[in-house]
């Protein structure tokens, strides 16, 4: 049993991308579904599919690769706020990742969103991860 399911999710995606897997299957939760939707909307993954089992369900993610270099679009994905050390950021202090080339995923009172959208809505929250 793992103590940080979000870190497990990010690690599975990172490892699958580094190993050039086309699809990765991950146990589902509402937060993982929202992170997956954000990654899809921002163009980091090709597609996703939620499968409901009797107990928990799973998420199948099709990873996206560059057509020329055959490298993963996800260069790195880092967990920032951890269960033992939460990292919060106000709307004015949400970081820009790689000068705007990456995204920060932030958990706000209005739900999970990118750091850019959180700045536009003027809300802060817990910085879940960086993707670039």
Swiss-Prot record:
A single Pfam family it belongs to is Ribosomal_S8
Q: Which Gene Ontology biological process is one annotated for this entry?
A: translation
**Would I find Ribonucleoprotein among this entry's keywords?**
yes
Q: In the record, what terms sit under GO molecular function?
A: rRNA binding; structural constituent of ribosome
Question: Does Transmembrane count among this protein's keywords?
Answer: no
PROSITE patterns named among the record's database cross-references: RIBOSOMAL_S8
Q: Which UniProt keywords apply?
A: Ribonucleoprotein, Ribosomal protein, RNA-binding, rRNA-binding
A GO CC term assigned to this protein in UniProt: ribosome
- Listed NCBIfam families: PRK00136.1
Family, according to the entry, reads as follows: Belongs to the universal ribosomal protein uS8 family.
PANTHER family (alphabetical): 40S RIBOSOMAL PROTEIN S15A
Biological role: One of the primary rRNA binding proteins, it binds directly to 16S rRNA central domain where it helps coordinate assembly of the platform of the 30S subunit.
What does the subunit section of this Swiss-Prot or TrEMBL entry state? Part of the 30S ribosomal subunit. Contacts proteins S5 and S12.
| Record-given protein name | Small ribosomal subunit protein uS8
Protein's organism = Flavobacterium psychrophilum (strain ATCC 49511 / DSM 21280 / CIP 103535 / JIP02/86)
């Amino acid at each position: 049993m793992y103590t940080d399911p979000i870190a497990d999710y990010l690690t599975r995606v990172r490892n699958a991308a580094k190993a050039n897997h086309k699809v990765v299957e991950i146990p589902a939760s509402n937060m993982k579904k929202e992170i997956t939707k954000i990654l899809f909307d921002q163009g980091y993954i090709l597609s996703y599919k939620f499968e409901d089992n009797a107990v928990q369900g799973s998420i199948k993610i099709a990873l996206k690769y560059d057509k020329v270099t055959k490298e993963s679009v996800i260069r790195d994905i880092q967990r920032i706020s951890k269960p033992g050390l939460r990292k919060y950021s106000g709307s004015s202090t949400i970081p820009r990742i790689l000068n705007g080339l990456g995204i920060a995923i932030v958990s706000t009172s209005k739900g999970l969103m990118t750091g850019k959208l959180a700045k536009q809505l003027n809300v802060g929250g817990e910085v879940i991860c960086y993707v670039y």
